[in-house]
C-alpha cells in the first residue's frame, strides 16, 4: 500500500456509450476524447466536493486511485465521512455497487458466496455473494476477524473468486473501497500486511474546517444529497480511463527516481520496505 498515485487524471473517456470491444479497438485517444474527459472528470469532482466538504485533495486522490485501477483504504475515526466518500464515488462512477458492513461474527462465505443444494436439480449450485459487483464498499473492514478479511485477498489481486474448486471471474472493472477505524478503537483487528499491500492508497479525511462544519450544520443531510446524485461516468468510460492510465509514458529518469525511493524504504530497520507490487503501483 502506498500514499501516492498517478498525477495524470485526465484520461480518455468516450463521448458516447460504446461496446467495450469497440473502445479497446481504438488506437489512441483523440484531442476531443481528452477534452470530453476533462469535462467529465471536472464535473464528477465538483459534485463529489459538494458532498464531501473541504476535502478536495482527498477527493482527487481517491478518484485518481480508482481510475488507476487500484483499491482504496479510508482510515479515520467514525463519523468523518469515509462511507459518504465511498458511496458518492460509487454513484458518480455509474458502477454496480454492494456494501458489506463487516462484523466480528462474519464468515468468508458471507462475502464470497456459497454452494447450496438445489433439490429440484439434485445438485449444488453456487450462490454468489456481495463481492460479485464492480465496486465493493467494505465498511469497517477491521471489525471482522483476520480469517474473514483474508477472503478478499484473491479478489483484490486477481479479480476472481475460487470456491469449491471452481474459479469465478468478477465483473470488470472491480474495485474495493474499504473503511477502517484506528486500532485504538475497541473491537477492531489489524489488517494483515498481505491485505494492506493490495491497497493502492490509504487516505485519512481528518476534521472539517470551521466553515465546512458550519455548512454541515446548516445544510442538507449528506445522505439525502447522495440520493440526488446521478452517474457521470459508466462502465465503458471507466474501462477506457484505465486504458488511458496504462498508456501514460514513464520516462527513464522517473523510473530511476522510483527505484531510489523504493530502495530507501527497504533500508530502514523500523518498517518493511515497499514490495514489488507497490513499485508497479507507483509506476
Task: Write out the residue ranges for each language-model feature.
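Basic, amphipathic alpha-helical bundle interface domains used for macromolecular binding and assembly
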Residues: 221-283
